[in-house]
Amino acid sequence: DDLRQEQLASQLIRCVANILANGRVPAWLYPYDIVAISFRGGIMEAIPNTISIDSLRKNHPHFTDLKHFFQEHFGQSGSDSYENAKANFVESLAGYSILCFLLQVKDRHNGNILLDNKGHIIHIDFGFFFLSSPGKNSGFESAPFKLTAEFIEVMDGVNSHAFNKFREL
């Protein structure tokens, strides 16, 4: 990947995060730092206490879906720790949905989406945004952001308070 493009993406994430904060929109983004030194070289901030959703599926011994993972790691539905993690999930899902819509980010597979130890999702790898496409194929995704049935299930369905909060954000 071209780290210069990743650096630009990180700067845009920081700008969008500042705009949301100034507008008092409680959507959450993690603007991690990248310093490109050359086309393929540079320094990227490590994002602590995270795992990709893809790695969860492949490496977690009893992984069935995200909702059950949340219950295993944050407590049963209704507990304070679970509800806090779910709120973090909703605010970060909203933040990255806004970001992906504005920047036209594509290639949002589960290897590019991290989950942290507080329930936030964090998107990484911004090789495909605006009309930039390393393989010159930018028409492969039509959705403006990633919202899966599994993400909706973590929010307790489309009729839930959490999903309504996501829509409001």
Model-derived regions: residue spans:
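Conserved ATP-binding subdomain of kinase catalytic cores across diverse folds
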Residues: 1-105, 117-133, 138-139
